Amino acid sequence: MAGRSLCLTRSSVPGTPFPPPVQQPSTPGPDLLALEEEYKRLNAELQAKTADVVQQAKEIIRDRQEVRSRPVSTQMKSCDDEDDYSLRGLLPSEGIVHLHSETKPKTKNIDPVNKVQNKLHSANKGRKTNSSVKLKYSDVQTADDVAIPEDFSDFSLAKTISKIEGQLEEEGLPEYIDDIFSGVSNDIGTEAQIRFLKAKLHVMQEELDNVVCECNKKEDEIQNLKSQVKNFEEDFMRQQRTINMQQSQVEKYKTLFEEANKKYDGLQQQLSSVERELENKRRLQKQAASSQSATEVRLNRALEEAEKYKLELSKLRQNNKDIANEEHKKIEVLKSENKKLEKQKGELMIGFKKQLKLIDVLKRQKMHIEAAKMLSFTEEEFMKALEWGNS
């Protein structure tokens, strides 16, 4: 059972998938934390599977040691002892002779019935004891060696009785026949003695049938025990093959465990490097966060100033528009005034030219007057000069 559960629980160990190498992100984020959690989870799974494999390997080794320390012969020892005891009880060294010897008184002479019994069982005595020894020390044996001897297979009560009657008719009763009937009257005839011997043989035949029946039962039990021994041997061979296979699997799992330990060490190193990188990234992230907060503060201030400047710029643009409108109006006014002034200038220039002409005329007149004064011009010349000046 332990081997089957081991095969079921370890089939997932060789193909345990490892996470593919994750590319390091350009910026620190939650991927590193997820990778760290994944490595921790894989570490816990590897430790649990390792403990399970080691425990099951110990159980398999312990079961194998128990099976090796307890061979099949010791497992069947109790059954063999019981069978040997029953067979020894049924087939003792004294045999059936001892059972029937109690029915007659002890005499110094030899009973001819006991001779017949000894003839029937002396050849089988060694076989019965040997068969009991074979049952005790042998794993494979035939039922004929234990159950029924070879001489019993051809035994028949009628043949035995006819044989004894023939011997009695030919030879007569032996001299020591009286020892058989020591407790019976000497007046018993030959027929009565024969009937007595027939009855005794009938009892012996019944007892022999009982013994044969018991032997048949024991033979069936021995066959059952043989089949059990065979099943036990097959089971032992299967268990041995299973143990060998499981030992190879244990070796394979040991190598896989060593490889997993190496991978675990590599993953631990990767995890430590990733943790260091994560710490560096966290420190850089904190620095970036602090600088980002300062930048955001400056940016907010700059945005506020930009908003202020936008408002001021809009105000300035509005003021410039107003000023431009006013200037435009002023320019228009100035243009109109300039036109007026130009017109006045033109008029003044015309007047000035006329005044210059008048001045020239007056100068000429003055010169003429002075010349007239000096030269005493005549009135006519003066009038000409005036006319010339008016023209």
From Swiss-Prot:
Keywords linked to the UniProt accession: Coiled coil, Cytoplasm, Cytoskeleton
Entry's Gene Ontology cellular component terms: centriolar satellite; cytoplasm
Keyword GTP-binding recorded: no
Record Gene3D superfamilies: 1.10.287.1490
Source organism, top-level taxon: Eukaryota
Major site of localization recorded for this protein: cytoplasm
Region (Disordered): 1-31, 65-85
Coiled coil residues, start to end: 188-351
Location(s), subcellular: Cytoplasm, Cytoskeleton, Microtubule organizing center, Centrosome, Centriolar satellite
Protein's recorded name: Testis-expressed protein 9
Organism in which the protein naturally occurs: Homo sapiens (Human)
